[in-house]
UniProtKB/Swiss-Prot annotation:
It comes from Histophilus somni (strain 2336). Keywords: Amino-acid biosynthesis, Hydrolase, Methionine biosynthesis. This is 5'-methylthioadenosine/S-adenosylhomocysteine nucleosidase. Gene3D superfamilies: Nucleoside phosphorylase domain. The gene is mtnN. The keyword Mitochondrion does not apply. The active site is at residues 12, 197.
Amino acid sequence: MKVGIVGAMAQEVEILASLIENKNVVHIAGCTIYQGNIQDKEVALLQSGIGKVAAAMGTTLLLQMFKPDIVINTGSAGGVSSGLKVGDVVVSTQTVYHDADVTAFGYAKGQLPACPPAFISDPKLTALVENVAEQQGINLTSGLICSGDSFINSAEKLAWIKANFPEVVAIEMEATAIAQVCHKFNIPFVVIRAISDVGDGEASISFEEFLPLAARQSSSMVLKILQSL
């Protein structure tokens, strides 16, 4: 099985990149792709850059150039679900854009034309993450992950997202764009993120402080999933 892994920032991919054997590195259009092996799995690890366009462009390149069988999105996220704390892990059941609004034409909030109301993560991959977390005693929350081209750093913005997407468990800036590309290419995907902040007025301070912890936690979870595939 060939596994595509996508992270936005250097800090979110550097642990996994350091573990790749027989490494080949490709730089293209502002993206970096590390290809090789982790354990017995063939992997292509993409550092896409931040935001929806960067994530979509990088994921498209990843799928076209390396033809992975599945895609895992890793990195950090802002926690929304009550009880989530820094370092906890979330896994997607579905993803949606919190900053897309074509409701004037009858679409659901977050839905784009020619797309489903939400992008559904591969149920088998989500279940695998849940099972591994249970076996390892990892605090995991499953649910809706919302994406947008904003770092949420205010209680007002967070409240708006929660009001419009009440099932949301975490927020970030790339997952739904990655999911949309995978949907178009018919490639199974799942999002595994660790919490770096809680999206309130202190989020930027928390993010800077706890990004390394979130990167370690999400990378560790991805490694456990690779072992289980």
